[in-house]
From Swiss-Prot:
Cell compartment(s), UniProt: Cytoplasm, Nucleoid
GO cellular component, one term: cytosol
Membrane-crossing residue ranges in chain numbering: none
Source organism of this protein record: Clostridium tetani (strain Massachusetts / E88)
Similarity comment: Belongs to the YbaB/EbfC family.
InterPro entries on file: YbaB-like_sf (IPR036894), YbaB/EbfC (IPR004401)
The name this protein goes by in its record: Nucleoid-associated protein CTC_00074
Subunit structure: Homodimer.
UniProt entry keywords in alphabetical sequence: Cytoplasm, DNA-binding
Amino acid sequence: MARGGVPNFGGGNINNLMKQAQKFQQQMEEMQGQLENKKFQASVGGGAVTAIANGKKEIVDIRIKPEVVDPDDVEMLEDLILSACNEALKKAEHETANEMKKLTGGMNLPGMF
């Protein structure tokens, strides 16, 4: 056992661990910055409604083809908007999870994103 009664933390190992943690944190911040600037687009209804989300999982744009707007069927348009938004957010979440897996080597670190 290493000095201080803590196994595997003697000598320079703690310094190496701290350096690795700092490097990991820097890589995470870089990845977050890149993802925040990415756009994730989803279209539904044959392209009638398109939603665009960013890497912060915010809807930043919604596009609706004019021919889809029917004052007598507002509910259909609402459903299309919800579907497009949810799909764009799923794409952003999926990409974030994939990038996180690459960074962590597949380790699951809950609460990181």
